[in-house]
Regions:
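N-terminal Rossmann-like FAD-binding beta1-loop-alpha1 element of flavoenzymes
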Residues: 2-28
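Conserved flavin/dinucleotide-binding core of flavoenzymes
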Residues: 305-435
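Active-site/ligand-binding neighborhood in enzyme catalytic cores
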Residues: 108, 117-220
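Mid-domain catalytic core of redox enzymes
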Residues: 22, 218-323, 328-337, 341, ...
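Short loop/edge segments at beta-strand edges and connector loops
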Residues: 7, 80-82, 213-215, 221, ...
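Glycine-rich FAD pyrophosphate-binding loop
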Residues: 20-45
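Dinucleotide-binding Rossmann-like beta1-alpha1 core, especially the glycine-rich loop
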Residues: 46-131, 143
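Conserved Rossmann-like nucleotide-cofactor binding loop
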Residues: 11, 34, 249
Length: 435
């Protein structure tokens, strides 16, 4: 069977892996010059490892991607260090990645810290998220944490992540999933995520699949014979089935044959973009903290400062100390228009708040990465709004991170989504009468 896949990120490659292993003729179309999607990386000439453009890590609970890695025989190439995550309060950073750390956090009274611990324990132990999607995270957390703890700790994080305009939108099931799945140890692949993606792509092409890089799909049409025509700028070809892993808006734009109701579902899904500045410094910026959570109202020009080399040794990056300055923003935000030099002028002065001795001469090199589609916004009762993977067009499937729910988007659930779509294709066409 001829199967097309749009997108060579974790979802698309996972689907291609399963379908090529089943003997199908698979063609993957990818608009970017490399595989990996949002998990793709880059490499300076003097580095031993690649580095993710947008910071990534795995949790020890990420069964889908760790299971795939085990299938491939690469488990010995996965590392799980335990870095330090910190919360900003009153000009200082405090560890905030364990029950003991929360009890020591000075930003709220001790009784509220205990209350936070009880709520976190409840969220970790309760198995059902469905009742939680009926209420906003703002309302639920304010009620059960109490106003002091919520205003100090979690409201600034929610506003930073989704924006003030979405504070009354994001549902509590999303927050439950963040707590439920989180582990203190964070995983990565030796050599970086790009090495993993490249190795997976080689396995897929060794089975006869084709991966066409730098080839964005311009249109999908259903034909009278039941096949699907996939058009690129260079050519067009017919396929028996197609799995698209692109953004909902792009899916709607390139597939005019979708019914109006399904297209409306696609266009209703809200999401934010990501802007990430990566800096290579000649020395360590902070004293061992990996992830710095920054409340928006504290005046930082970005949401998170991640000192990657407090997690992975700078020896893998030629001695460079790697710092990410990142934010989730509406694609209309000025950060998507400003030049790298203009953003550096906004970002670099803020680094003095992490280290008063910081000097911009410490910066050896910088890179700017932007994506207009990076973070879905899950609204109240979001499960009712998610488009089905199996679209109303026969043989056409849609598997994107906007359908990952209630879990937060990431490579683990992208793998799960891609393999689920591949299984649907196999099952549907086994009957020779796909829906």
């Amino acid at each position: 069977m001829r199967i097309a896949i749009i997108g060579a990120g974790p979802a698309g490659l996972s689907a291609a892996y399963d379908l090529s292993r089943a003997g199908h003729r698979v063609t993957v179309f990818e608009g970017a010059p490399s595989v990996g999607g949002l998990a793709s990386g880059f490499k300076a000439p003097h580095w031993e490892w690649t580095l993710e453009k947008f910071y990534h890590h795995w949790f020890a609970s990420d069964a889908a991607i760790l299971g795939l890695i085990k299938e491939l025989g690469w488990s010995n190439e996965v590392l799980f260090p335990r870095p330090v995550t910190a919360m900003y309060h009153d000009g200082k950073f405090y560890a905030f990645d364990s029950a003991l750390a929360v009890l020591r956090f000075p930003g709220i009274p001790f009784v509220d810290r205990v209350r936070c611990g009880v709520v976190a324990l409840y969220l970790r132990l309760t198995p059902r998220w469905e009742p939680l999607e009926r209420v906003t995270a703002d309302a639920w957390l304010r009620k059960w944490l109490g106003p002091r703890a919520y205003e100090c700790m979690w409201k600034p994080m929610l506003v930073g992540k989704f924006g003030e305009e979405n504070l009354q939108v994001v549902n509590m099931a999303w927050f439950w999933a963040r707590i439920h799945a989180r582990t203190p140890r964070l995983g990565t692949f030796k050599g970086g995520f790009q090495v993993f993606m490249d190795k997976l792509a080689k396995v897929i092409t060794a089975r006869g699949a084709e991966i066409r890089l730098g080839t964005p799909v311009k249109g999908i049409e259903k034909r009278a014979d039941g096949t699907l025509r996939v058009a690129t700028a260079a050519d067009a070809a017919g396929f028996d089935a197609l799995i698209s892993t692109c953004s909902p808006v792009l899916m709607a734009d390139i597939t005019p044959d979708l019914p109006a109701a399904y297209t409306a579902q696609l266009r209703t899904l809200k999401s934010l973009g990501a802007v990430v500045m990566v800096l290579a410094l000649d020395r360590q910026l902070t004293n061992g903290i990996y992830w710095h959570n920054l409340p928006k109202d504290a005046g930082f020009p970005f949401l998170a400062m991640v000192e990657h080399t407090n997690y992975i040794s700078p020896a893998h990056y030629g001695g460079d100390h790697i710092v990410y300055c990142g934010d989730y923003l509406n694609p209309s935000h000025e950060y998507f228009r400003l030049a790298k030099e203009e953003l550096l002028e906004r970002f670099l002065p803020a680094l003095e708040r992490f280290n008063p001795h910081f000097d911009r001469r410490w910066v050896r090199q910088s890179w700017l990465w932007r994506s207009a589609y990076a973070q879905p916004v899950p609204s109240v009762n979001h499960s009712r709004n998610i488009p089905a993977i199996r679209t109303p067009v026969r043989g056409l499937y849609f598997a994107s991170m906007s359908q990952v729910y209630p879990w937060d988007r990431g490579t683990n659930f992208a793998v799960e989504m891609g393999r689920k779509a591949a299984k649907m294709v196999t099952a549907d066409f086994a009957t020779r009468d796909p829906p």
